[in-house]
C-alpha cells in the first residue's frame, strides 16, 4: 500500500546546491585555473584588471558562485561517500551541511566587505 502522506525530505535544497557546485566546478573552475595559473604569471592578464573586477558587483557575484557552490558539492560528496564506506558519523548531515552553511555565511560576509 502506498503511503498517502509521505514524509517530506530535506534533501532537495541540498541536492540543488550539490548540483550547482558540480556544474560550476566542471564549467568555470578550469577557466579560473587558466587565468590564475597561466595567464596571470605570464603577464597576459593585468593584476589591476582582476582586482578591479573583484571589487565590482558582478565580480563579487562570481566570487560567491565560485566559492560557495563547490564547497556544498564537496561536503555533500564527503557525507555520502562516508555513508557508502559504512562510516556513519552521528548527525553527519547536520555536521557536513552545517559546515557548508557556516562557510556560506562566512564567504557572504567576506565578499560583501570587499
From Swiss-Prot:
Job description of the protein: Anchors the catalytic components of the fumarate reductase complex to the cell membrane, binds quinones.
Lineage: Bacteria, Pseudomonadati, Pseudomonadota, Gammaproteobacteria, Pasteurellales
Subunit structure of this chain's protein: Part of an enzyme complex containing four subunits: a flavoprotein (FrdA), an iron-sulfur protein (FrdB), and two hydrophobic anchor proteins (FrdC and FrdD).
Listed transmembrane segments: 24-44, 50-70, 92-112
Name of the gene: frdD
Native species: Haemophilus influenzae (strain ATCC 51907 / DSM 11121 / KW20 / Rd)
Topology within the bilayer: Multi-pass membrane protein
Name this polypeptide is given: Fumarate reductase subunit D
Family annotation (InterPro entries): Fumarate_red_D, SQR/QFR_C/D
Family: Belongs to the FrdD family.
